[in-house]
A protein has these predicted regions:
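Mobile "lid/hinge" segments at catalytic clefts and subdomain interfaces of large enzymes
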Residues: 167-337, 351-357, 584-605, 629-631
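A glycine-rich phosphate-binding loop feature that marks nucleotide/adenosyl-phosphate handling sites
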Residues: 53-56, 104-106, 161-168, 252-255, ...
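Conserved phosphate/anionic-ligand binding catalytic regions in large, soluble enzymes, centered on
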Residues: 101-104, 170-177, 266-290, 457-463, ...
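C-terminal substrate-recognition/cap domain of FAD-linked oxidoreductases
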Residues: 50-52, 58, 258-266, 270-483, ...
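Activity-critical C-terminal alpha-helical subdomain
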Residues: 411, 511-560
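N-terminal glycine-rich flavin-associated loop
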Residues: 39, 63-95, 117-160, 171, ...
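N-terminal flexible segment immediately upstream of the FAD-binding catalytic core
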Residues: 1-86, 90, 102-131, 160, ...
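Ferredoxin-type iron-sulfur electron-transfer modules in oxidoreductases and energy-metabolism complexes
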Residues: 544-565, 581-661
Length: 661
């Protein structure tokens, strides 16, 4: 199916208008009736949603950004997505595609049309005895791996958010994770995509005649892709920059390594879409080559005297074939010591400057595992550890180690003061520069007053995450965060690193893409975007943004609401298990709406309060199953079901009191 290409001379949506006003909610949708009629000519009336509660519910993803869409479209098939693109182009509206909403850089929220592609795209098909899987964008990584487990295989990408992260986001953010590195990430394990371009053209890049079809349906685009490839490959400096940045984890900007790694416009396009964060096309289906599941593992948490000691050991540990090397700084160890089932190696001492490495080896046979463990244990014996460390194949010991590593984010986020927002950032540098980079980050935390910040991450890949909390209200706090960001950018780029390793450029790093790649490659990215999306309808402000303050615009403000839900980080882990997720609201959305209500009430916007209250009665209260399944999935231990029960009791008490008056 194709539609006429939009007139490239038509004005692009101005995505900067929203920088000043989207924190307000506003009772009425800003969409004109003509736009709604156009959308509903193909999409069912109930699936084009403009009520305030629907729009506010989708204003947040897992990041620290907040954008209220003008309408939410629940797409049921590929035709409806293509139609939404056409209507958006005809009426100068932006389109944000959303599935799991676990994005950490702001790429899953927008102020135009938000198209939910989770509900209608949940099919998957296993082929070749599990070696290949075709999967639609609304399926979670955990669901895919559960199907593949029957064949003792799994996806290469292993994001920590696998329970909620969906394939649409996995492709669009080039997801990797703790074990896959750059060898088994999305870019490396993908073998085909079915794409809907902004023009409405549908291309299956896995088809034998994909190049011919792309030339037939989009001749200018096909030729432009090859022209950009020649431009890149003929410039030795550009080739060197691309090779350096993509030698380690990198989700900054577009995947220009596609121009070096592939021939033919369809395959180049396919891999450019990987990591494009919904700015180039809709991924209607992805085909992955899967990898074997390791049957056996041995694990330890080794404590070093300081970060330098831990990071200095990395090259030798990588050389032993370690599957996982996870770094935790002193602040992380201090947090970990409070865990109920903390690893013994991090207990029994006062934390000063120590650092820890979670080291794990994988194998298919017991003999192979024993050999790897022997090599690893011998190396640890030669290193200067703060205290002795031993490997274990016991499930309880492995669970304890991983609870420590994976529980850090939740523990710090849960302990943050009410009303603050948690920011989880990630960067990557060459492994040999990791020690100095971590030391530099700690200095920046101290100089900017982020005393509670912690550093952890995938040390094997030179990829570290850091978590800090702040209350983004007032000029002083925004200036502090802006100053920290500028200094952090200088630190990472001076180490020849990448400003985003896993989480995507999003809105958080869009103003800094030019600084990482230089003017020439930034222009290549601009021309690529213009060639595929001439009207700029897909996710404007994400990846490319000339506004130097874009990263501090529309920052999420989390007012104090109710004690039971104040610690919510809006990660979305609760959503896949919620019985009402396809009927009304999810636990995350119930909390997002309560926060919007509290903010409106604080501003004296009682029309918004009344509008939200009216619809929350059914959407938020009556349709909640109150089975507390969300509690089991929530990393910070929020029981939204219990919270809704309290609201129901209060409503009941109010009715009883009015009867007896």
């Amino acid at each position: 199916m194709t539609t006429a290409s939009p007139d490239a001379s038509h004005s692009q949506p101005d995505h900067h208008d929203h920088h000043e006003h989207t924190h307000g909610t506003g009772v009425h949708s800003a969409l004109e009736s003509q736009v709604l009629e156009s959308l509903r000519a193909v999409i069912a009336d109930d699936d084009v949603r403009t009520r305030l509660i629907d729009r506010v519910a989708y204003a947040s993803d897992a990041s620290h950004y907040y954008n209220v869409p003008k309408a939410v479209i629940v797409a049921t098939d590929i035709t409806e997505v293509a139609h939404a693109f056409k209507v958006a182009a005809d009426h100068d509206l932006s389109v944000t595609l959303r599935s799991g909403g676990t994005s950490l850089s702001g790429q899953a929220s927008g102020d135009g049309l938000l198209v939910d592609v989770r509900r209608g795209f949940r099919n998957m098909s296993v082929q070749d005895n599990g070696r290949i899987i075709r999967v639609q964008p609304g399926v979670t990584v955990a669901q895919v791996n559960a199907r593949l487990a029957l064949y003792n295989r799994k996806l290469g990408p292993d994001p920590a958010s696998e329970s909620a992260a969906t394939i649409g986001g996995v492709v669009n953010n080039n997801s990797s994770g703790m074990a896959c590195g750059t060898e088994f990430n999305t870019y490396q394990t993908l073998s085909g995509l079915t794409l809907v371009l902004p023009s409405g053209t549908i291309i299956d890049t896995s088809a034998d005649d994909a190049d011919a079809k792309l030339y037939a349906l989009e001749p200018k685009l096909a030729e432009k892709l090859l022209q950009l490839q020649r431009r890149v490959k003929d410039n030795p400096e550009s080739v060197g920059i691309i090779q350096r940045h993509f030698a380690i984890k990198n989700t900054m900007g577009y995947g220009l390594n596609s121009f070096l790694d592939f021939e033919g416009p369809a395959k180049i396009l396919e891999h450019l879409v990987v990591g494009s964060e919904g700015t180039l096309a809709f991924v209607a289906e992805a085909i992955f080559e899967t990898i074997p599941v390791a049957k056996l593992a041995t694990t330890t948490v080794a404590v070093f005297a300081d970060l330098h000691g831990a990071t200095s050991a990395l090259p030798d540990l990588v050389g032993t074939g370690a599957a996982t090397l996870e770094l935790m700084d002193a602040a992380s160890i201090k947090v970990g010591q409070s865990f109920d089932d903390a690893p013994q190696s991090i207990l029994g001492f006062d934390v000063d400057k120590q650092a820890a490495l979670l080291i794990e080896y994988h194998a298919q046979t017991a003999d192979e595992l024993a050999e790897r463990e022997h090599i690893g244990q011998k190396l640890l014996g030669d290193l200067e550890l703060f205290k002795p460390s031993a490997f274990s194949t016991q499930t309880a010991d492995r669970n304890s180690a991983w609870q420590f590593r994976k529980g850090l984010y939740a523990k710090v986020a849960k302990a943050r003061p009410s009303g603050t927002t948690a920011l989880l950032e990630d960067v990557a540098v060459p492994v040999e520069r990791l020690a100095n980079t971590c030391a530099g980050l700690q200095e920046l935390f101290d100089s900017n007053g982020y005393e509670e910040a912690v550093i952890f991450g995938h040390a094997k890949d030179g990829n570290i995450h850091f978590l800090l909390t702040d209350r983004f209200e007032g000029e002083d706090n925004l200036k502090r965060y802006n100053s920290f960001t500028d200094d952090m950018v200088d630190l990472i780029l001076s180490a020849e690193g990448n400003l985003k390793a896993e989480h995507g450029t999003g809105r958080a790093m869009a103003p800094f893409v030019r600084r990482q790649y230089g003017d020439e490659l930034y222009e290549v990215m601009q021309e690529l975007k213009q060639a595929i999306d001439p009207r700029g309808i897909l996710n404007p402000g994400v990846i490319l943004d000339e506004d130097p303050a874009a990263h501090i615009s529309n920052v999420k403000l989390n007012p104090t609401v109710e004690e039971e839900i104040d610690t919510c980080v809006e990660c979305g882990y609760c959503e896949p298990v919620c019985p009402s997720k396809d009927l009304t609201l999810t636990p995350r959305q119930r909390i997002v709406v309560r926060r919007a209500r509290a903010k409106a009430e604080g501003q004296g916007d009682y029309a918004t309060v009344a509008e939200l209250d009216k619809d929350y009665e059914y959407m938020g209260k009556q349709t909640c199953a109150v089975d507390s399944m969300c509690l089991r999935a929530c990393p910070v231990g929020i029981d939204t079901g219990k919270f809704i029960k309290r609201l129901r009791r209060e409503d009941s008490n109010t009715v009883e009191q009015s009867v007896w008056k």
